[in-house]
Structures are given as C-alpha cells and as structure tokens.
Regions:
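Nucleotide-state-sensitive switch-loop elements of NTP-binding domains
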Residues: 1-71, 83, 94
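Residue-level signature of catalytic and energy-coupling elements of molecular machines
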Residues: 5, 56, 103, 118, ...
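Amphipathic alpha-helical transducer elements in NTP-driven molecular machines
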Residues: 9, 32-35, 39, 55, ...
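Conserved C-terminal guanine-recognition region of P-loop GTPase G domains, centered on the G4
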Residues: 60-73, 77-129
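Canonical P-loop GTPase G-domain recognition
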Residues: 99, 107-164
Length: 170
C-alpha cells in the first residue's frame, strides 16, 4: 500500500498493523500524490510482480482526480456522513472512477442520507461506475467488495495493464 496524506503516519501505522507492507508519503502542503511519488514508493516497497498495489491518495475529491497515477482501477470512497450530493459537487473524480465505495452504511439509521439519490447522482456523472455499500464496523457489503477484487486479481486481463478496467465485468 502507498498511503498519501499531508501529514502524519497514522493511517500507514494502522495498515502496517495488519501485516501489510506500506509506505507513507506525506505531501506537506500538497493536495495529491503524483506519478513520481508513486514511482519512488514502488521502488521502496519493491512489490513482487504478481502483487496488488493499492494507493490511497490524499483525502480530498478535487486534486487527486487531476493526476494519472498509472492505476488500473480508480476507486472513489464516499462516506454517508458527507452527503449524497458529493457526486454532483465533485463530478470529475466520480466521472474518472471505476468504482464508488459508499462507507459507514451502519450509520444510515442515524442520518438523513438518501442512498438511492447518491447512487443516481454518481450514475448521472458516470453511468458505468460500480457501487459497493460497506461498513467496516459491521462487515456489511465487504464480501461483495472482496469478490470484485478477487475476480479482477485472478482475471487473465489483470496482467494486461493496457486493457480498460471497464471491460471486465462479473
């Protein structure tokens, strides 16, 4: 995992505690990772050729959308606490993403958040975006997300990074 934040190693430490190799990249006043940072991170991590590299960019919905990091699949993560209109407010990241993960769904009983409206907004911006609703607290929806990852990782086309991620489908 390459973990990007402006400051701290908090998230990298949490990831590392699971046994996963992680490199922290702090951008200081910068609002995103760039390809050169990813290249340096990969050189430091030295992942095996058949491994999966996950990149968590700096946590905003504007700057990271503007930079190609060479990823095969782009995933945008949206918490239900942020409001269902985020895909309309920040369309560029949703337009470029292959997947939207809607998180913290265990909080829905306590919020005024319209899941269907959020998904509709995301689909208006990007009709091909796949949506997974998950809760890290309860585990709800994680099997579907893991299934997506497993399918793509074991797919022969996974080895071909030139193939568009939108061409594979379960």
């Amino acid at each position: 995992v390459i973990e990007g934040d402006q400051e701290t190693t908090n998230d990298a430490q949490k990831i590392q505690s699971t046994g996963c190799k992680v490199i922290q990249i702090n951008t200081g006043t910068g609002c995103h990772l760039d390809a050169a940072m990813i290249e340096r991170g990969i050189q430091e991590l030295q992942p095996p050729l058949d491994s999966v590299l996950m990149i968590e960019n700096v946590g905003n919905l504007v700057c990271p959308a503007l930079f190609d990091l060479g990823e095969q699949t782009k995933v945008v993560i949206l918490s239900v606490t942020e409001g269902e209109d985020k895909p309309m407010k920040y369309p560029h990241i949703f337009r470029l993403s292959d997947v939207m993960i809607l998180t913290k769904i265990d909080l829905l009983p306590y919020l005024q958040f319209d899941v269907e409206k959020c998904i509709d907004y995301a689909k208006k911006v990007n009709p091909h975006i796949r949506v997974y609703q998950v809760s890290a607290t309860t585990g709800a929806g994680l099997d579907d997300w893991y299934g997506f990852l497993s399918y793509h990782i074991t797919s022969p086309s996974f080895k071909n990074t030139l193939e568009s991620p939108s061409t594979y489908d379960r």
